Amino acid sequence: MKMPKNNVYTVSQLNGEVRQLLEGELGRVWLNAEISNFSSPSSGHWYLTLKDHFAQIRCAMFKGKNRTVTFRPANGQQVLVKGSISVYEPRGDYQLIIESMLPAGDGMLAQQYEALKMKLAAEGLFATDTKRPLPTNINKIGVITSATGAALKDVLHVLARRDPSIEVVVYPTQVQGDNAAKLICRAIELANARQEVDVLLLTRGGGSLEDLWCFNSEDLAHCIYNSALPVVSAVGHEVDTSISDYVADVRAPTPSAGAELLSKDADDKAHKLIAGLSRLKQSWQHYQLKTVQKATALENRLQRQDPKRRLEQFEQSFDEMQLRLNAALNSRIHKLALKQQNLSHRLSQQSPEHRLTLEAKRLDYLTTRLNEGIKDKLHDVELSLKNSAHQLQTVSPLATLSRGYSITQDESGKVLLNAKDAKTGDLLTTRLLEGELRSKVV
């Protein structure tokens, strides 16, 4: 037998070539089949065989992927899986690496979901550069959900706890069923027409794939994309991901998480305000210290340039010169007299009265500027303190009472949130803006 000169493979090289060909040519595939030989070792990976009446294929689903499966696979169960063909090179076996798994009953919906997801992604509805940023200061939130659902209660509870000053406008709508997507679109359009809120929170609680199917509507996706108001999608539980989550500007895993995302903790606001006032006080004290230091430095400079002191120095020098003249020889008297005349002329050019007048005017000007600067700074600080006091007032519980609300407590001081919390015979105290009422449950 004649040996070929080229294309001689080792077994590992051949298996590697086959793996690259299969993975490159087939890519991802969908498979509808029955489970057999299912095993789940301590590593957390799943190993199984998928089969029909005529053939079978070995499969693996690693733990990073099988964590997203919402049911426990069992032998004999019919499933729909998505995966990619690969080769396990040590044995030369070709296998399917599973990425997602659904019961066969959900298969049609899953295929529709993937097809719509790919279509909308190609149209650019998921692009990050088109997403609207959330407002920095949110004062009013529009909630699009069922008026009787648990999601609305969760949202209101979180907002009341974190920031009671945020107003909520509910746009009630059906969030399940054939007409739900159309009704949700109407709610979004109504909110955009009214322009009465800063942001929209589209939300509902968890459910099956069929329950959440309205949030996978193509019409709803375009409605969210075209909204002028920013939209936060908080649909289902953390493991649920709908088309609305991809299109929305921000996705929150649950209704409560959506409410927390859109609210700032009231205690944090108060702490930041107090910290701001403290920094303002320190800045004012620093400014006062600097002003006093500058005034002291100016005063020292003026003292060093005092005309009276300079005149005394000149007089002392003149006396010394007179003593020297008197002690000099007669032959130098004429010369010294001329020198004295020259010195007298120089002194007349440096009149102390003229310089004293200039320095006095300068001192008056600096004093006036210093007083005006202090008055202006005090005025600015007073305005800032008034604004800070107004902000504290808006988050005060007393502000809530001033709008007509009241707080009811039992004998232990616990605040009652539900009428069911009060029992017959309990003594209750209702606090109003001014005073309180005491009552007994009958």
Swiss-Prot record:
Which cellular compartments is it found in?
Cytoplasm
Signal peptide (residue range): none
Record GO biological process: DNA catabolic process
Q: List the catalytic activities from the record.
A: Exonucleolytic cleavage in either 5'- to 3'- or 3'- to 5'-direction to yield nucleoside 5'-phosphates
Which Enzyme Commission number(s) are on file for it? 3.1.11.6
Name the UniProt key words of this record, in alphabetical order.
Cytoplasm, Exonuclease, Hydrolase, Nuclease
Give the record's GO CC terms: cytoplasm; exodeoxyribonuclease VII complex
Molecular function terms from GO: exodeoxyribonuclease VII activity; nucleic acid binding
The primary site where this protein sits is cytoplasm
Q: What does this protein do?
A: Bidirectionally degrades single-stranded DNA into large acid-insoluble oligonucleotides, which are then degraded further into small acid-soluble oligonucleotides.
Protein family per UniProt: Belongs to the XseA family.
Q: How does it assemble?
A: Heterooligomer composed of large and small subunits.
Q: What is this protein called?
A: Exodeoxyribonuclease 7 large subunit
Q: Which organism is it from?
A: Shewanella woodyi (strain ATCC 51908 / MS32)
Highest classification ranks of the organism: Bacteria, Pseudomonadati, Pseudomonadota, Gammaproteobacteria, Alteromonadales
